[in-house]
Design a protein with these regions (language model features):
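"…together with the soluble PPM/PP2C metallo-phosphatase catalytic core" -> "…together
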Residues: 1-177
Length: 177
């Protein structure tokens, strides 16, 4: 993404793909009208390229990559509605959540059908992987995965905004994908 940003950001400026600021928002945000948006494409491209380099050695990357691209599509649609359709709100929260639920549901379904998933989790600070205490979540594993995935995705979304705060958070999340 460090290589792509200097190329893509000026291109987004040229296309006038800038942030639309709501009139009823904070006055401080008005000066940021036109801040380039759709920068998520840069991060998504970097994550996809990096993942594809390792996919042959670790095919377990595929479902996580699917989920990442799916969430990226939701972000793209949100930005597209804001920029091209000139609706500063983009997708409403319910539409975003429905999309996230569908993508996460497909991911969880794949995990459960693959037979490779372990529904037990290590209780922290109980002795490590070999001697620790494990809690078998059983079918509670499904809502747990939804909670973790949707919480992580929306945590990044809440941090995202006009100030470029998403960059540091996205780097952390992408590192642990």
């Amino acid at each position: 993404s460090a290589i792509l940003c200097p190329i893509v950001i000026p291109f987004l400026h040229k296309l006038k793909f800038g942030q639309q600021v709501r009139d009823d928002g904070p006055q401080a945000h008005l000066k940021k009208q036109g801040t380039p948006t759709m920068g998520g494409l840069v991060f998504l491209t970097a994550v996809v390229i990096t993942s594809l380099l390792y996919i042959r050695d670790n095919p377990r990357i595929i479902p996580v990559l699917f989920m990442t691209v799916g969430f990226g599509v939701i972000g793209f649609l949100d930005d597209y509605i804001k920029i091209v359709m000139k609706r500063s709100e983009g997708l409403n929260p319910v539409q975003k959540l429905i999309g996230q639920f569908i993508i996460t549901g497909i991911f969880v379904y794949y995990l459960m059908c693959s037979g490779e998933v372990e529904t037990s989790m290590l209780v922290p600070f109980t002795g490590g992987f070999e001697h620790g205490i494990y809690l078998n979540l059983g079918f509670l594993f499904i809502p747990f995965v939804f909670f973790v995935v949707l919480g992580t995705d929306n945590g990044v979304n809440f941090t995202d905004g006009l100030d470029g705060l998403c960059t540091s958070v996205t780097i952390l999340v992408a590192t642990f994908l």
